[in-house]
Amino acid sequence: MNYRNIDDLNHCILQHLSILPRDFDLIVGVPRSGMFPAHLLARPVTDIDSFRNGHIYQTGERGKTFNMNNIHNVLVVDDSIATGKAMKKCRELLKDIEHLYNIQYCVIYAVPLHSHSVDYFFEIVDYPRFFQWNIMNHSILQKTCMDIDGVLCADPTPEENDDGEKYRHFLLNAPPLFIPKVTIGTLVTSRLEKYRPETEAWLQKNHVKYNKLVMLNLPDMAARQRANCHASFKAKEYGSSTDNMLFVESSMTQAVEINRLTKKPVLCTETFQMIYESKSLYYNLKSGETFPWLRRFMIRMRNKLSSHSTSSTCNNGCKMWKKFFQRSV
């Protein structure tokens, strides 16, 4: 699994900025993901002599009107290129004015297959890949275990966490944080099982879609504190699943422990770092990190069988292999 967060993006730009010519008059970001790197590239830049003479780029001035007659070299920037469809759409949108400018195209992250589709790219990041700015709405969440407190909603304050009426009020009215638009595979929380009605009510009110909700089956908060099993409880659910490829956890301490126990990656929303110091061979094969050609072959077979299974000639053996390939990638 290849993951990049905003710190990685900023570092990548700083490390590879020299590949871009310095004569671009205008940088155009592709909404929405391309706007952030576009702003980073368009920050005021100068050299020593220019600085001494008080000359800097004025990209930060609000309300400034640029004379388009002075714009000649334009760089269109997106965060990444995958299939190439988004970049192709950009070219089509700019087709009517491309004769007026020298327009070139840049992405920060490219896949090997489409790196030639742009004029500049900063880093090759192959599949499977995920970014901080899109992972919470990515289809990978369908194969993800996710914590609730600190991820979907704020953590309770010490005053609210009384295992009584104040806590029940918090559960029903917790302020939301990251609410995905896609379905989450499994919600795994250290909340006690007795608070399932309140938890489900909050999830429904905040339009959180999920397939499964796993809660800690202990009698009260005191028993939970004695057990001190937050990370091990979550790791047991995550590690026992062959479908779930990721765990999203709010606590860095727990994230590291879940990764250690399962040998599977954990995304920590405390820092938006991906923890995968410990890995298993099974995970590496399934994610494509080991023998990526094998994963590509499995995907091709899955897609081929999926199209074939709709026909009347697909027998039980065909359906069995289709199910196998679906679970394997």
Sequence positions of predicted segments:
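Substrate-recognition "cap/lid" segment bordering the active-site pocket of phosphatases
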Residues: 196-244
